[in-house]
C-alpha cells in the first residue's frame, strides 16, 4: 500500500514539474515583452515630443520672419508710392517747363525774325540816308564846275568839228599820226564811259566817293592837258589825204553817238540836281525812323538777352529735373527689384511655412496616432503586467511546490533505500507491481497528452493576446528583449539540485524527469532566438 501511494505521488510530482517548467518559460517571455513594450513606448513618446517642439519652434520662426517681411513690404510699398507721386510731380513740372520753353523759343524766333527785318530796313534807311546826306552844297558847286567844264568841252568840240570839216586833204605822211589820234580818241571814249558810270552813281555818294571824285578831277585835268596836245596836233593835221575820208565818216558817226550819250549824261545831271527842301524833310523823317528803329532794336536786343537768360535758366532747370527723374527712375527700378526679391522670399517663406504647417499637422496626426497606440500599448502593458503578476504568483506556487517536491523527493530517497532493502520480493509481487506501474504509466501518458493539449491551447491564447497590440501600426514590441538572460538565472541556480533528482524509480528502474522538461527548454530557446534576431534587426 505504501508503494502504491509512493508511485502515485511521484507521478503527480512529475506532472507538476512539467507544468511548472512551461509556466516559468511563459513568465520569461512575458517579462521580456513588458520590458520591450515599455522601452518602445518611452522612445516613441520622447521622439514625438522632440519632433513637435522642433516643428513648433520652426513654425514660430517662420511666422516671425513672415511678419518682418510683411512690414518691410509695406514700407517698400509706401516708399514706392511716395516716389511715384514725386516722379509724377517732377514729370508735370518738366512738361510745364518744356511747354514754357517751347513758347519762349517760339517768341524768341519771332522776335529774332522781327529784329532781322528791322535791321534790314535800318540798313536800307542808312544807305538812303547816307546817299541823301552826301549831296551837300560843296557837291552842288562841284556839279556846277563839271557843267562848266562840259560846256567848255562842247565849245571845244564845235571847234574840232570845224577843223575836221576843213581837213579833207590829209596827206599820206600823217596816216600814222591819225591812227595815234584814233587810239587816243578810243581811250577818251573809254574814260568818258567811266565818267558816265560815275555820273549814274551820283545818287549814292558817300564819304568814300569823295576820294573817287578827287581822282576823277585829277584825271579830268590830265585829259584837258591831253586835249590841248590833240588840238595842237589837229591844227597841224590839215593835209589829210582822200583815202582817209571813210575814216573821217566813221569818226563822225562815233561823234554823233558820243553826243547822244552826252545828252543822256546831261539829263542824269539834271535829275541829280533836283534835291529840294522836300527831300531834306524826307531825310529828317528817315533819320527819325532810323532813331526809332535803333531804340526798338536796343529794346528787342535787351528782351532777347532776358529771354536767352530765362531760356538758359529753364534749360538748366530742365536738365536738373531730367537728372533727378533719371535718379528717381533708377531708385524706383532698384526698389522694384528689391520688392520682387522680397516678394519671392516671402513666397518662399510662405511655402516653407505652409510645408511646416502641413508637416506639423502630419506630425500631430502621427502623434495622435502614436498616443492612441500608446494607450493601446499601455492597456496591453497593464494586461501583460497582470499576466506577469499572475505568472510570478504561479512561479511562487511552483517554487513552493518544488520545495515540497524536494522534501518528498528526500522522502522518496529514504523510501528507495528501504525498497532496496526489500528486494527479496517474489516474482508474483513483481508482476503485480509491473502491471500496476504499466497501468499508472498509461494513465499518466493519457493525462500528459491532455495537459499537452491544454498547454497548446494556453500558448495559442497567449499568442493571440500578445498579437493584439502588434496589430496596430507603430507598436513593435519585441518579446523577451533584454530579459532572457535574467530569466535564465533561476534555472541555472536550480540545476544542481535537479541533478540530484535524476535517479531511478525504485520499482521500475526508470529515470526521473528533471524540472525543465524538453517542452520548456524548447519554448525558452525559441524565445531567446527571437529576441536575438529582433535585436539584430533593430541594430
From Swiss-Prot:
GO cellular component, one term: extracellular region
Keyword Acetylation: no
Residues making up the signal peptide according to the UniProt record: 1-42
Chain positions of A- repeats: 118-152, 153-187, 188-222, 223-257, 258-292, 293-297
Sites bearing Pentaglycyl murein peptidoglycan amidated threonine, chain numbering: 508
Residue stretches of each D repeat: 435-440, 441-446, 449-454, 456-461
One GO BP: phagocytosis
Bias-annotated ranges (Basic and acidic residues): 314-340, 349-375, 384-401
Motif (LPXTG sorting signal) on chain: 505-509
Role of this protein: This protein is one of the different antigenic serotypes of protein M. Protein M is closely associated with virulence of the bacterium and can render the organism resistant to phagocytosis.
Name of the protein this chain belongs to: M protein, serotype 24
Organism: Streptococcus pyogenes
Amino acid at each position: 500500500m505504501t508503494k502504491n501511494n509512493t508511485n502515485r505521488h511521484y507521478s503527480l510530482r512529475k506532472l507538476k514539474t512539467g507544468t511548472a517548467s512551461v509556466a516559468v518559460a511563459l513568465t520569461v517571455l512575458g517579462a521580456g515583452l513588458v520590458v520591450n513594450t515599455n522601452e518602445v513606448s518611452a522612445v516613441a513618446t520622447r521622439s514625438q515630443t522632440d519632433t513637435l517642439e522642433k516643428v513648433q519652434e520652426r513654425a514660430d520662426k517662420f511666422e516671425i520672419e513672415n511678419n518682418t517681411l510683411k512690414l518691410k513690404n509695406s514700407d517698400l510699398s509706401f516708399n514706392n508710392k511716395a516716389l511715384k507721386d514725386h516722379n509724377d510731380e517732377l514729370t508735370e513740372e518738366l512738361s510745364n517747363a518744356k511747354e514754357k520753353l517751347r513758347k519762349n523759343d517760339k517768341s524768341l524766333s519771332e522776335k529774332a525774325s522781327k529784329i532781322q527785318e528791322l535791321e534790314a530796313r535800318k540798313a536800307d534807311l542808312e544807305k538812303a540816308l547816307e546817299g541823301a546826306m552826301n549831296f551837300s552844297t560843296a557837291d552842288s558847286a562841284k556839279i556846277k564846275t563839271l557843267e562848266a567844264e562840259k560846256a567848255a568841252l562842247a565849245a571845244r568840240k564845235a571847234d574840232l568839228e570845224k577843223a575836221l570839216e576843213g581837213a579833207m586833204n590829209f596827206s599820206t605822211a600823217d596816216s600814222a599820226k591819225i591812227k595815234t589820234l584814233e587810239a587816243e580818241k578810243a581811250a577818251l571814249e573809254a574814260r568818258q564811259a567811266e565818267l558816265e558810270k560815275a555820273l549814274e552813281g551820283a545818287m549814292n555818294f558817300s564819304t568814300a566817293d569823295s576820294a573817287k571824285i578827287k581822282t576823277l578831277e585829277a584825271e579830268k585835268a590830265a585829259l584837258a592837258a591831253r586835249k590841248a596836245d590833240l588840238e595842237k596836233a589837229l591844227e597841224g593835221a590839215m593835209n589829210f589825204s582822200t583815202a582817209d575820208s571813210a575814216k573821217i565818216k566813221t569818226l563822225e558817226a562815233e561823234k554823233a553817238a558820243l553826243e547822244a550819250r552826252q545828252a543822256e549824261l546831261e539829263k542824269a545831271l539834271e535829275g541829280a540836281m533836283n534835291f529840294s527842301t522836300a527831300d531834306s524833310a524826307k531825310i529828317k523823317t528817315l533819320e527819325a525812323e532810323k532813331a526809332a528803329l535803333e531804340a526798338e532794336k536796343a529794346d528787342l536786343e535787351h528782351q532777347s538777352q532776358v529771354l536767352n537768360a530765362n531760356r538758359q535758366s529753364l534749360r538748366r532747370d530742365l536738365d536738373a529735373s531730367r537728372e533727378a527723374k533719371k535718379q528717381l527712375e533708377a531708385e524706383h527700378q532698384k526698389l522694384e527689384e528689391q520688392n520682387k526679391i522680397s516678394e519671392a522670399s516671402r513666397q518662399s517663406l510662405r511655402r516653407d511655412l505652409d510645408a511646416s504647417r502641413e508637416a506639423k499637422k502630419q506630425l500631430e496626426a502621427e502623434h495622435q496616432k502614436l498616443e492612441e497606440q500608446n494607450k493601446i500599448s499601455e492597456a496591453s502593458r497593464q494586461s501583460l503586467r497582470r499576466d506577469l503578476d499572475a505568472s510570478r504568483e504561479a512561479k511562487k506556487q511552483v517554487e513552493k511546490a518544488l520545495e515540497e517536491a524536494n522534501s518528498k523527493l528526500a522522502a522518496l530517497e529514504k523510501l528507495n533505500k528501504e525498497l532496496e532493502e526489500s528486494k527479496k520480493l517474489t516474482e508474483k509481487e513483481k508482476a503485480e507491481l509491473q502491471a500496476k506501474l504499466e497501468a499508472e504509466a498509461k494513465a499518466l501518458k493519457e493525462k500528459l497528452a491532455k495537459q499537452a493539449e491544454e498547454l497548446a491551447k494556453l500558448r495559442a491564447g497567449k499568442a493571440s493576446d500578445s498579437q493584439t497590440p502588434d496589430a496596430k501600426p507603430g507598436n513593435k514590441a519585441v518579446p523577451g528583449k533584454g530579459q532572457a538572460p535574467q530569466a535564465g538565472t533561476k534555472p541555472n541556480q536550480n540545476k544542481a539540485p535537479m541533478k540530484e533528482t535524476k535517479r531511478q524509480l525504485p520499482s521500475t528502474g526508470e529515470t526521473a524527469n528533471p524540472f525543465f522538461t524538453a517542452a520548456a527548454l524548447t519554448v525558452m530557446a525559441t524565445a531567446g532566438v527571437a529576441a536575438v534576431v529582433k535585436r539584430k534587426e533593430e541594430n
